[in-house]
From Swiss-Prot:
UniProt-listed GO biological process terms: translation
Keyword Phosphoprotein: no
Subunit structure: Homodimer. Part of the ribosomal stalk of the 50S ribosomal subunit. Forms a multimeric L10(L12)X complex, where L10 forms an elongated spine to which 2 to 4 L12 dimers bind in a sequential fashion. Binds GTP-bound translation factors.
The entry's keywords: Ribonucleoprotein, Ribosomal protein
Known role: Forms part of the ribosomal stalk which helps the ribosome interact with GTP-bound translation factors. Is thus essential for accurate translation.
Family stated for the protein in its record: Belongs to the bacterial ribosomal protein bL12 family.
Source organism superkingdom: Bacteria
Gene: rplL
GO MF annotations, alphabetized: mRNA binding; structural constituent of ribosome
UniProt cross-references to InterPro entries, sorted A to Z: Ribosomal_bL12 (IPR000206), Ribosomal_bL12_C (IPR013823), Ribosomal_bL12_C/ClpS-like (IPR014719), Ribosomal_bL12_oligo (IPR008932), Ribosomal_bL12_oligo_N_sf (IPR036235)
Protein name (database record): Large ribosomal subunit protein bL12
Taxonomic placement: Bacteria, Pseudomonadati, Chlorobiota, Chlorobiia, Chlorobiales
UniProt KW Ribosomal protein keyword: yes
Length: 124
């Protein structure tokens, strides 16, 4: 009997039959089906420092309009596609989020545009 045939036959067993097979193998060979390696891995993982996930989504927050408010409003309109009134309200209501959940590259590009227009910006 090949191993493949044996595996297929075991696959046909019911859960009760599989449980009985495990018990019989444990008794016959004097082994335990309990996972030994899992306890070792869990203990090793507990000693490690917590893993910090790298942030993948960023928000660009306008913290202040600065001296050249008109240029900042123009930049906000270009970035967001908002109308003049909406862009002005966003700039006047600083601190406000200009763009949410964007890539790091896009966030840095937008922050640079707003800073070049005279605004104070924060990337979160």
């Amino acid at each position: 009997m090949s191993i493949e045939t044996l595996v297929e036959e075991i696959g046909k067993l019911t859960l009760t039959e599989a449980s009985e097979l495990v018990k019989a193998l444990e008794e016959k060979f004097g082994v335990s089906a309990a996972p030994v390696a899992v306890a070792g891995v869990a203990a090793a993982a507990a000693g490690d420092a917590p893993v910090v996930e790298e942030q993948t989504e960023f928000d660009v927050v306008l913290t202040a309009a600065g001296e050249s408010k008109i240029n900042v409003i123009k930049a906000v309109r270009a970035i967001t596609g908002l109308g003049l009134k909406e862009a002005k309200d966003l700039v006047d209501g600083a601190p406000k989020t200009v763009k949410e959940a964007i890539s790091k590259d896009e966030a840095e590009k937008i922050a640079k545009e707003l800073k070049d227009a005279g605004a104070s910006v924060e990337v979160k």
